[in-house]
Every structure is written in C-alpha cells, then in structure tokens.
From Swiss-Prot:
The lineage of its organism: Eukaryota, Metazoa, Ecdysozoa, Arthropoda, Chelicerata. Monomer. GO terms for cellular component: extracellular region. Its main location: secreted. Expressed in salivary glands. Salivary tick protein that acts by scavenging histamine at the wound site, outcompeting histamine receptors for histamine, thereby overcoming host inflammatory responses. Binds histamine with a high-affinity (Kd=18 nM). Contains two binding histamine sites (H and L), that appear to bind histamine with differing affinities (high and low). In vivo, when tested on a mouse asthma model, shows a profound inhibitory effect on allergic asthma. Disulfide bonds join C66-C187, C137-C166. This is Female-specific histamine-binding protein 1. It comes from Rhipicephalus appendiculatus (Brown ear tick). It is found in: Secreted. The keyword Signal applies.
Length: 190
C-alpha cells in the first residue's frame, strides 16, 4: 500500500514543474480557467463529481461518493456565492450536505482569478484550482488543507454525457494516478 501511495505521489509530482502544474499557464490556458465566470455558471447549473484521483476529503469524508453541487445567492459586490454540496461516504450511506461560501481567488501567479476558495460552516478554508472548464464540465485540481495537491476532479452537468473536452483534459492531467468513479447510476434514488 505504501508503495502504491508513493508511486501515486511521485507521478503527481511529475505533473508539477517548479511547484506549478503544467496546465498553470495563464497565457495558454487562462481562457478556460476563469473562476468567477465558473461560479456564476454554477448558480445556473447543477454539477456532479464524475471522477476523482483521491478518495478522502476533509469535508466529504472517507471514500466519498455521489457528490453533487449547486450554488445560490450570487453576490456580485463581494464576488461570492453560497455553494451547496451533497455527498455520501463510508460513515453514512444517507446523503449528507454542506454549505460553503465560495470566492474566486488567484493561484500560481495568475492576474485573473483561476481558483476558488471555500469557507465551510465549521471554519475550514480549502482551495480548488480550475485546471480547465468548458460548457457543462470542468476539471479541478483540489488542494489539501495544507495547500498540497490532493488530486484531480472531473465535474459535469450530466454524468452520462461528459463532454470530450473535459474528459480529455482530465485524462491528461490525471495520467498515472489512480482514478475512480464518484457519481454513478448507483447514486440515483430508486
């Protein structure tokens, strides 16, 4: 198990160049990394977490599954939204939820906001970097509570029809990492 984790860690680091992932290039990729535009769209559309390269999260718990998100209360003046997440984990097979204040942020020396900082109801502060976004989907580079990379997430509005653009980017960025399905048909109520 330690060998597998060490290998995954080394492979994840191979994606990083001088503490900066290969996709963290504002000139080349900034058009698809606009965090404020993404948060505004989140108010209009619900998204499901389709795939992830990690399985434990400080908010969603261990072995999280069936994660979905939406947002409300768009505040243009303060530039934030109230994000709502629903999920299950190995501690409870009943849907749980959390509300978090989501604010656009800047990472990797960007001039434009390319990350989202979440403040949970219990005061945790977590940051996700928007590695890629397109119509109806996005790829997140989730940072752990200590700021180190936790892994990649693939989100889409329809888990049965993930746009090729996001699937290709996710597969490129997550190459060599263990990938698991998070939102599947098992998540739907019977």
């Amino acid at each position: 198990m330690k060998l597998l984790l060490s290998l995954a860690f080394v492979l994840a680091l191979s994606q990083v160049k001088a503490d900066k992932p290969v996709w963290a290039d504002e000139a080349a990729n900034g058009e698809h990394q606009d965090a404020w535009k993404h948060l505004q769209k989140l108010v209009e559309e619900n998204y499901d977490l389709i795939k992830a390269t990690y399985k434990n999260d400080p908010v969603w718990g261990n072995d999280f599954t069936c994660v979905g998100t939406a947002a409300q209360n768009l505040n243009e003046d303060e530039k934030n939204v109230e994000a709502w997440f629903m999920f299950m984990n190995n501690a409870d097979t009943v849907y749980q939820h959390t509300f978090e204040k989501a604010t656009p942020d800047k990472m990797y020396g960007y001039n434009k906001e390319n990350a989202i900082t979440y403040q949970t109801e219990d005061g945790q502060v977590l940051t996700d970097v928007l590695a890629f976004s397109d119509d109806n989907c996005y790829v997140i580079y989730a940072l752990g509570p200590d700021g180190s990379g936790a892994g990649y997430e693939l989100w889409a509005t329809d888990y049965t029809d993930v746009p090729a653009s996001c699937l290709e980017k996710f597969n490129e960025y997550a190459a060599g990492l263990p990938v698991r399905d998070v939102y599947t048909s098992d998540c739907l109520p019977e």
